[in-house]
Amino acid sequence: SPVQFRFKCSKLPTVEFFCQTANIPGISLGQATIDTPLKSIPFPGDELNYQDLGISFLVDENLNNYKEIHDWLIGLGAPQNHNQFSTLRDTGTDRFPGQTTNSPNNNTVPDGGTYSDATLTILNSKNIAKVEIRFHNIFPTSLGALSYDVQASDVNYLQANVDFSYMYYEIVQL
């Protein structure tokens, strides 16, 4: 039987039920090399590199789920004015699974709506949650195009791809 999963991000509530594919991103560790007269010797580095989290989802007929991601990207990039980023930042009470806040004395700009946390839940053959991959501080980096085709003979549902960057993820056995 195919492995089932759920993708949950409170900043994207309408994407969860339409999610078609998701990946557990790869991770790599940099390394340092010390040259010796006989052989170069590798040593573990101190920086982890995470690949992007990619998901694909069916787009609803009103484009609501596509617009959620689109508006998040617009807010991050602020292509028309700086108020777009301020508005996004001020909507930052939507963290999942836990809310992260800055302390009032750290003199930094609160991250607000810039980031969200997300969870990819892996289900067993009986649809019981077995593993959670918890992504911390995700934000979208790309949203795929939508292609309309009036000549298609079958019912083709619109599907879009989105890539996220994030700080790190953890794998939790349930």
PLM features: residue spans?
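Glycine-rich, low-complexity intrinsically disordered segments
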Residues: 1-174
